[in-house]
Every structure is written in C-alpha cells, then in structure tokens.
C-alpha cells in the first residue's frame, strides 16, 4: 500500500529526529508503522539514526518492532546494531524485538554488531540471548565475522558466551597475524592441529607468514611440529623456504626434526641453501642437519647454494664438510655448475677443498664437458683463469673432441684463448672432425686469435677429415685479412 502524505511526514520527522512533529502526527492518528516505497518504517529510520526518544514514542504508539523491510529483509534491530546505536538496541529489545531474526542473507543483528566491532551493542544482544553460533548463507558466524574484523573485545565476548571456533576462523586469524584473537579462539576450542583444504595446519600457515608471536601461541597450545602437508612439507621446511630465521629457531627449539624430507626429498637445509639464508643454514647445521642429504634428483644443499650463487652459504657448507664431488641425477658437480655460471669466488672455494693432483675432480665431465670447457664456452675469463691456476688440464677434450682452446676459437674469446695458450694448451690437437684450433679460428675469421695461435706454433697446413686447411676455410668464407695473415705466416694453397 503506497504511503500517504501523512505517512511521508512521519517518516521525514523520524529521519530528522523531530520529536515534536512525530508526537503531533501520531496524535492525529498517523500510522506508527508508516513506511516508504522500500518498506523502511519510521521506527527503522529512528533506530538507525539513534533517535532513542522517537524510538520509544513509536513503540509506545504500537509500531511493529519486528517489521521486516522489503529491501534486504532488515529489521529495526539489525539497522540499529549495524549503526552502533546502543540506546536504540536497548529500547527495541525491551520492546520485544526478535534478537535472532535473519535478513535475506541469513545475517542477524549480532553479526552486524560483530562486523562493526561495537562491544556495547554485542553485549546487549548477548544478554538478550542472541544465538552466537548461527551462521549466515555463506556459513559465517558472528565469531568469524568478528575475527575477520579484528575486534578482540568482541571475539572474547562471543567466546565467553559459548561461540564455537570452527577451524576456518583460526586459519583466518593466523593469516592476518592476530595473535590475541588466535589465543581466544584456541581457548574457544579451535584445534591447532587441524588441516585446511590445502592440508596445512595453522602452524604451517604461521610459518609461511613468519609471525613468531603466532608460532609461540600455537606451540603453547599444543601445535604438532611434525605434521606433514600433502607435499610432505612441515612447518620447519616451510619456514626455512620462506627465510624466517626466528621462526626456524623457535621450531627447532620445539623439537622439529631438522632432517625430515618433503615428497621431493628436500630438507630444510636445502631450502635455506637455495634461498641463501645463511642464519637459517647455521641454525640447522648446529641442530644436526645432514649436510650431504640428497633429494630425489640427488641434489644437495651445496648444489643448491652453488646454483644460486650464494657465496656465504657455500663457504659455510664447505667449512662444515659438504661433499664437493657429489653428482646430481643429471651428472653435474658443484664445480661444473659454478663454472658454467661463472661464479669465480665459489669456484675458488671449491678448488681449495681438493688437491691440485685430484684429476678426477678437476677434470670431471658431464655430457662430455668439463668445468673448463663450460667456462670457456660461456666466456667467463676470470673463471677460466681460476680453473687453470687450480690445476685443471687445458687439453682435456669435450664434446666431439673439442678442447677448451677450440671452443675459445669458435666463440671468439680472445683473452681466454691467450690464457689457455699461456697455460700450456696444445695448439695442434685435433677434434673428431680432424680440425685444429687454427682451423676453427680461420672458420670464424678471428684474426687476433689466429695471431696468438701462429705465435704459439700452430701447424699452418694441417688438413681436417674433409681435406680442408685453415687457409681453405678462410678463403671459402672470404676472410681476406685472415687469408693474408695465414699466407704471410707460410700457409700453402
């Protein structure tokens, strides 16, 4: 039924807090339940605005305290609670308001008050026997809403009133780092060892976030440090992976197994090494971590530290006895990995751990490549220098019989070619195709390298298996300067 002019006047008076007009209109017989086009009554407007005297007057004149607004299904009590109007709430409850009425979303006045964090309104509703464990259509309770809002006093009041802390609320509080709320939830019966949909416990979640105070609260409540998630991760491996030093220390102190492996065989020490977190690596080693443990790919903590280039972690691991010669499943050693990446400082540290006469270590191959040939190919001049000074054989051949010198010629690395020659590289060795370093230099048109090779006694007229000489290769590629240089040095047609 559309509102009359008199109804509209009453609604306007209630909206603006005009007590005199409200009294006058009611005295004329205007309906106390007057409502606008959306179904909002004068009582609802007065309640949400906090006009307590108008609320009292309307109720005294028969206004329906439980009238439901057409839009969203709200009541005056819900509106008053949502707008923190404690006096309105008190009057409405005294007037018989249904404290557990639900709106279209299944929310109650208590949920609205919990969302807004008004402890006074919450207490009024609880005293009126509001249901603390009812949930809305999303499955959210007043306690969950209060925890999400971060209002400690409201959470405590709900807990004291018997609210049950389902575990989703605990995970929510942990993710937000709300230590005080977490403590309350645990006291309300939340299980610190329950797993979420990702099979992680609250302790694991706190370890990922790195919140030490939350970790300490959970541990004090009996959180189990040894629980695994679906990937075999524990709170400790996760904390190490995310680099949270204080959390790792706390978990180790609580008895966490430092050598436990995840589904891939990874350990906390490997995670610390891969992340370059020296303090965590130190804590774990002091707690007895197996320094040479291997994952399913036969990677070790040292392998990870070398791969990522963390010099300080590599130094620590070497001092503590990490194996420098262990190969992973692909056949790589720490030396090979350091060489290909040009990690000169790490390479030096590795070389210091072995005797220069240890040819098996220095010249170890993977897919026919040595540390030297890999470093040469990548153009890491300083790395090549360190390797040569460390005793590697400059003449060990790699893939297809190519020596480090040949690779330097192919890639045009002049300084490296000079280093190799000065370190005793044989300029006349042949690869599987019968080619010499000079032939490769001629094929690439590397004038400066050719000069180095000639000065080192390179044989000018050797032929490869295709019966080509260095001069022929230069002529074929129209390298006029190279042709002239070779002929001047004595190369024959």
Where are these regions (language model features)?
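Ankyrin repeat A-helix N-terminal signature
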Residues: 12-17, 45-51, 79-85, 112-118, ...
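Ankyrin-repeat-protein effector appendages
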Residues: 1-9, 156-169, 175, 188, ...
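Eukaryotic tandem repeat interaction scaffolds
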Residues: 366-369, 373-378, 382-385, 389-418, ...
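Ankyrin repeat boundary/linker residues
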Residues: 3, 36, 69-70, 103, ...
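Start-of-repeat signature of ankyrin repeats
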Residues: 6, 39, 72-73, 106, ...
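N-terminal segments that cap or nucleate solenoid repeat domains
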Residues: 1-41, 45, 181-194
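Ankyrin-repeat inter-repeat connecting loop/turn
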Residues: 32, 65, 99, 132, ...
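Ankyrin repeat structural motif
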Residues: 18-26, 52-59, 85-93, 118-126, ...
């Amino acid at each position: 039924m559309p509102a009359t002019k008199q109804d509209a006047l009453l609604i306007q008076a209630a909206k603006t807090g005009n007590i005199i007009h409200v009294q006058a209109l009611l005295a004329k017989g205007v309906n106390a339940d007057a409502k606008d086009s959306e179904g909002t009554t004068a009582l609802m407007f007065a309640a949400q605005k906090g006009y307590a005297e108008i609320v009292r007057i309307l109720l005294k004149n028969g206004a329906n305290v439980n009238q439901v607004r057409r839009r969203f299904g709200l009541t005056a009590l819900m509106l008053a609670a949502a707008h923190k109007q404690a006096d309105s709430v008190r009057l409405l409850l005294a007037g018989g308001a249904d404290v557990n009425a639900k709106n279209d979303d299944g929310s109650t006045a208590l949920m609205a008050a919990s969302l807004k964090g008004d402890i006074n309104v919450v207490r009024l509703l609880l005293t009126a026997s509001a249901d603390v464990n009812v949930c809305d259509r999303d499955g959210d309770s007043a306690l969950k809403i209060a925890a999400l809002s971060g209002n400690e006093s409201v959470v405590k009041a709900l807990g004291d009133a018997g609210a049950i802390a389902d575990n989703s609320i605990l995970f929510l509080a942990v993710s937000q780092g709300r230590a005080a709320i977490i403590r309350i939830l645990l006291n309300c019966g939340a299980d610190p060892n329950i797993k979420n949909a990702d099979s992680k416990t609250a302790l694991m979640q706190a370890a990922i976030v790195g919140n030490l105070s939350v970790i300490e609260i959970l541990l004090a409540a009996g959180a189990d440090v040894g629980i695994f998630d679906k990937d075999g991760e524990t709170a400790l491996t996760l904390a190490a992976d995310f680099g949270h030093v204080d959390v790792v220390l706390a978990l180790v102190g609580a008895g966490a197994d430092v050598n436990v492996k995840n589904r891939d065989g990874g350990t906390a020490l490997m995670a610390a090494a891969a992340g370059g977190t020296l303090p965590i690596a130190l804590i774990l080693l002091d707690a007895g971590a197996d320094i040479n443990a291997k994952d399913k790919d036969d990677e070790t903590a040292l392998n990870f530290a070398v791969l990522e280039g963390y010099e300080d972690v590599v130094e620590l691991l070497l001092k503590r006895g990490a194996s420098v010669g262990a190969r992973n499943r692909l056949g790589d050693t720490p030396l090979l990995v350091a060489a290909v990446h040009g990690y000169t400082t790490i390479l030096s540290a590795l070389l210091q751990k072995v005797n220069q006469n240890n040819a098996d270590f220095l010249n170890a191959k993977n897919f026919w490549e040595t540390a030297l040939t890999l470093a040469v190919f990548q153009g890491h001049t300083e790395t090549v220098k360190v390797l040569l000074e460390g005793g590697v054989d400059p003449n060990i051949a790699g893939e297809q019989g190519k020596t480090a010198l040949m690779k330097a010629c192919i890639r045009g690395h002049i300084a490296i070619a000079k280093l190799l020659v000065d370190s005793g590289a044989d300029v006349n060795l042949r690869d599987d195709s019968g080619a010499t370093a000079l032939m490769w230099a001629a094929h690439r048109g590397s004038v400066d390298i050719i000069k180095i090779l000639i000065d080192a006694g390179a044989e000018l007229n050797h032929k490869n298996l295709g019966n080509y000489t260095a001069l022929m290769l230069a002529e074929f590629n129209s390298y006029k300067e190279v042709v002239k240089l070779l002929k001047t040095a004595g190369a024959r047609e």
